[in-house]
């Protein structure tokens, strides 16, 4: 009986051993049928399963190729503004610099005939101012003469309308005279009044001199003066006996004309005496 039990146990152990050996064989064959040692491949698969788990840490290195910003460097060649430098040679204004040496020879030319030009200018001033005295300053002479007649209570007084016309004509002529020549013009007006009085004294030798109205006419601003052309003493200097009369009439003219016409008369006009018919700049 013992032997029978031992044999039965051995049979059971053998069957269990064969069943245990046969069970893993069909599991390993479908995975790798070509390999004859399936037991050695099991740890390899386990190792391969562990490596991909460990190798999955490397994918975070993939964003490095995404950081390539090299195409953004392409706009740098785009802002090249070299073509706008082309207009600089077009705007070269070098030819206008050529006229600068041209006026240089002109500077010594006006410096040479300075004395001749001054002489010519003085002659022209004398001629023009003498013409002004003969024609244009007659209204100023008559205005001052009217004030002189009023101051001396003369019966010969102009009408208001004709006196206003004389004032307008006188102021128009004074504005046309240069400022440096107005003093000489005032002196010539005073000389003309003195000559006018001298003519009246010659025509009326009596002690009482009556002032006659001037015979000049002023149609449309045109002035005609005949007494200065007929008088041979049109040019001359103030005589010593005429000096008080000259100073009186000059003061009257300097009080009347500048205020009436609102023009500037140099202050030295009240102290200097200019010869009649001679003009210049002081």
UniProtKB/Swiss-Prot annotation:
Substrate of transglutaminase. Pfam families: Gliadin. Residues 27-59, 112-122 have a biased composition (Low complexity). Residues 224-240 have a biased composition (Polar residues). Keywords: Allergen, Repeat, Seed storage protein, Signal, Storage protein. InterPro entries: Bifun_inhib/LTP/seed_sf, Bifunc_inhib/LTP/seed_store, Glia_glutenin. One of its GO terms (molecular function) is nutrient reservoir activity. The keyword Flavoprotein does not apply. Residues 60-111 have a biased composition (Pro residues). Residues 1-20 form the signal peptide. The alpha/beta-gliadins can be divided into 5 homology classes. Sequence divergence between the classes is due to single base substitutions and to duplications or deletions within or near direct repeats. There are more than a 100 copies of the gene for alpha/beta-gliadin per haploid genome. Belongs to the gliadin/glutenin family. Gliadin is the major seed storage protein in wheat. This is Alpha/beta-gliadin A-III.
């Amino acid at each position: 009986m013992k032997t029978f039990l031992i044999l039965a146990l051995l049979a059971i152990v053998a069957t269990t051993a064969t069943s245990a050996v046969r069970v893993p064989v069909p599991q390993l064959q479908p995975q790798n049928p070509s390999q004859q040692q399936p037991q050695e491949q099991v740890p390899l698969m386990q190792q391969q399963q562990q490596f991909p788990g460990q190798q999955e840490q490397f994918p975070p290195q993939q964003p490095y190729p995404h950081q390539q910003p090299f195409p953004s460097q392409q706009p740098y060649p785009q802002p090249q503004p070299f073509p706008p430098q082309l207009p600089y040679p077009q705007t070269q204004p070098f030819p206008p610099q050529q006229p600068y040496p041209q006026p240089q020879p002109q500077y010594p030319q006006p410096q040479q005939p300075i004395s001749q030009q001054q002489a010519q200018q003085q002659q022209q001033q004398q001629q023009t101012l003498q013409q002004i005295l003969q024609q244009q300053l007659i209204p100023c002479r008559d205005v001052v003469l009217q004030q002189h007649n009023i101051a001396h209570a003369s019966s010969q007084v102009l009408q208001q309308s004709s006196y206003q016309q004389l004032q307008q004509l006188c102021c128009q002529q004074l504005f046309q005279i240069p400022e440096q020549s107005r003093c000489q013009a005032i002196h010539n007006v005073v000389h003309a009044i003195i000559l006018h009085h001298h003519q009246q004294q010659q025509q009326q030798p009596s002690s009482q001199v009556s002032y006659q109205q001037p015979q000049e006419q002023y149609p449309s601003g045109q002035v005609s003066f005949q007494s200065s052309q007929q008088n041979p003493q049109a040019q001359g200097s103030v005589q010593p006996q005429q000096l008080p009369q000259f100073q009186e009439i000059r003061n009257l003219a300097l009080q009347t004309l500048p205020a009436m016409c609102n023009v500037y008369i140099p202050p030295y006009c009240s102290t200097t005496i200019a010869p009649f018919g001679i003009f210049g700049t002081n």
